[in-house]
């Protein structure tokens, strides 16, 4: 195995380990919104993905329009509802989301041929307490950040079609 491939695999393994450490360092969930999102995903799991009754939003336009603002995110979270321990499901989902976010950021930096990409990501993680806190959340904004970094890399380095597809899923 050559040196570059070893560095790449080690970097990805480090991002995976960091993502799980961020989530499982504490037995608590970082943000109560994760409980809402995982429960909403559970409702889709139990009632089907086209379920559109939201009795908990009586005083919102969501009740009238029967639309879920985070529909794609809630579909993404359905597999994490197959665990008996809901907190574990939230934390596992958060670790996967943090890993995907950091991986997209890493890919964006590699696409732009930025040296020491893993070091820049580590600097980003510890740059402010709020960054680490947000990475610990089980919320859709983390994935949006990763997709935005990836879209920017395609914008700077060329690639209109990838930007189109990223925009469609983001």
Give the positions of each predicted feature.
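Short acidic/glycine- and proline-prone juxtamembrane loop motifs at membrane-interface regions
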Residues: 133-142
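Start-transfer (signal-anchor) and selected internal transmembrane alpha helices
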Residues: 1-24, 107-111
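Helix-to-loop transition at the C-terminal end of transmembrane segments
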Residues: 21-35
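Transmembrane-helix motifs of polytopic, lipid-linked glycan transferases
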Residues: 92-113
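Transmembrane and membrane-interface helices of multi-pass
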Residues: 119-129
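Membrane-interface transmembrane helices that cradle and orient dolichyl/undecaprenyl
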Residues: 148-163
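Extracytosolic helix-loop segments that constitute the early lumenal/periplasmic catalytic or substrate-binding loops
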Residues: 42-64, 72
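Short hydrophobic/aromatic helix or loop-helix immediately within or flanking a transmembrane segment
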Residues: 60-85
């Amino acid at each position: 195995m050559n040196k570059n491939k070893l560095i790449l695999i080690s970097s990805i393994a480090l991002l995976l380990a960091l993502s799980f450490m961020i989530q499982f360092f504490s037995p608590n969930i970082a943000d109560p919104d994760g409980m809402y999102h995982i429960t909403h995903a559970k409702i889709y799991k139990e009632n089907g993905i086209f379920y559109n009754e939201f009795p908990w939003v009586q005083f919102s336009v969501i009740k009238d329009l029967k639309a879920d603002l985070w529909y794609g995110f809630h579909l993404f979270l359905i597999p994490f509802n197959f665990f008996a321990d809901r907190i574990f499901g939230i934390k596992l989902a958060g670790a996967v989301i943090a890993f995907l976010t950091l991986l997209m950021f890493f890919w964006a930096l590699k696409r732009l041929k930025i040296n020491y990409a893993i070091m820049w990501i580590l600097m980003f993680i510890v740059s402010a307490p709020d960054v680490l806190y947000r990475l610990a959340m089980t919320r859709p904004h983390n994935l949006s950040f990763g997709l935005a970094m990836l879209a920017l890399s395609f914008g700077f380095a060329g690639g209109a079609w990838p930007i189109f597809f990223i925009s469609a899923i983001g």
